[in-house]
């Protein structure tokens, strides 16, 4: 069963109040969507960090607001500029029947197969914007490198998309280039050949 993050509403906005929340193990947040203009609140630091580690930025999660379970995107995560800890989170509450635009990671599977084929992968972009209903949005898009046996350029149009999903960017944009690996065995030089012949004649 997918975990549900509890969203607690708050009405005070002072700096001291926000710092108090953080010391008590919470992260200040704001939630917004079609039926929610802007709702300040806070979430459990421990529970959010666990979900964030799994889902990442733009990840889709279940969130409980006013006793109602909703689907939300982790829209923005602010971190302390020195300590690096999370200090604020934005959640976008989704309407199930309205398409959304989301930036998702591109994942390459079976990358190890390229080495055995004398090839190397040169990545050009790591994410791409897609459009679809919230229920159809994947956590990432996959490119299976098992299919590539020679040098080529992989474009956005080459990505196999889940049903109901489309890429909003230029489909001719290059995602990655598969090239010949430059790592080859060092050829034996004339000098080494002569050294080998000399050692044989002296033995």
From Swiss-Prot:
**SUPFAM superfamilies recorded for this chain?**
Ribosomal protein L25-like (SSF50715)
Q: Where are the transmembrane segments?
A: none
Region (Disordered) residue ranges read 182-203
CDD domains noted in UniProt: Ribosomal_L25_TL5_CTC (cd00495)
What are this entry's molecular-function GO terms? 5S rRNA binding; structural constituent of ribosome
Note the superkingdom of the native organism.
Bacteria
Q: Name one GO biological process term.
A: translation
UniProt KW keywords: Ribonucleoprotein, Ribosomal protein, RNA-binding, rRNA-binding
Listed under GO cellular component are: cytosolic large ribosomal subunit
UniProt xrefs under InterPro entries: Rbsml_bL25/Gln-tRNA_synth_N, Ribosomal_bL25/Gln-tRNA_synth, Ribosomal_bL25_b-dom, Ribosomal_bL25_C, Ribosomal_bL25_long, Ribosomal_L25_dom, Ribosomal_uL5_bac-type
User: Could you tell me which NCBIfam families the record lists for this protein?
Assistant: bL25_bact_ctc, PRK05618.4-5
Q: What does this protein do?
A: This is one of the proteins that binds to the 5S RNA in the ribosome where it forms part of the central protuberance.
Quaternary structure, per UniProt, is:
Part of the 50S ribosomal subunit; part of the 5S rRNA/L5/L18/L25 subcomplex. Contacts the 5S rRNA. Binds to the 5S rRNA independently of L5 and L18.
The family annotation for this protein states:
Belongs to the bacterial ribosomal protein bL25 family. CTC subfamily.
Protein name, UniProt field: Large ribosomal subunit protein bL25
